[in-house]
């Protein structure tokens, strides 16, 4: 099983990625691979959250301005992942990122491509 997520880098690179794993443990391993370790959850409404490196400040990771703008959170560092959330048997569980974030990533990438073309 895989789930769609949106990865946001500190340099404002934003793209769709896949979180893999049949079990929660395997999915967490996949998330750790993207973020570099354990993660904290930043809630973004009922159906989405942003996952960030739990020790990002201790690791002196760079500020992620785009993730801060999208989440409304005052300080985020390092890589961030947006995933969906839904109610499960044991509380909330992760699922595909909501479509509005997939569209946002596509729109931002399109705008960046146009800007890069104009700069060339």
PLM features: what roles do these ranges have?
Residues 2-120:
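Domain-length accessory/inserted modules outside core catalytic folds
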């Amino acid at each position: 099983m895989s789930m769609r997520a949106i990865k946001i880098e500190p340099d404002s690179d934003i793209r769709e990625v896949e979180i893999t794993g049949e079990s929660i443990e395997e999915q967490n391993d996949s998330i750790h691979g993207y973020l570099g370790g354990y993660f904290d959850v930043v809630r973004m409404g009922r159906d989405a959250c942003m996952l960030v490196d739990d020790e990002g400040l201790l690791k002196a990771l760079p500020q992620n301005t785009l993730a801060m703008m999208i989440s409304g959170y005052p300080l985020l560092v390092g890589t961030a992942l947006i995933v969906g959330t839904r109610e499960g048997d044991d509380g909330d569980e992760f699922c595909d990122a909501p479509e509005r974030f997939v569209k946002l990533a596509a729109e931002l990438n399109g705008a960046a491509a146009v800007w890069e073309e104009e700069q060339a």
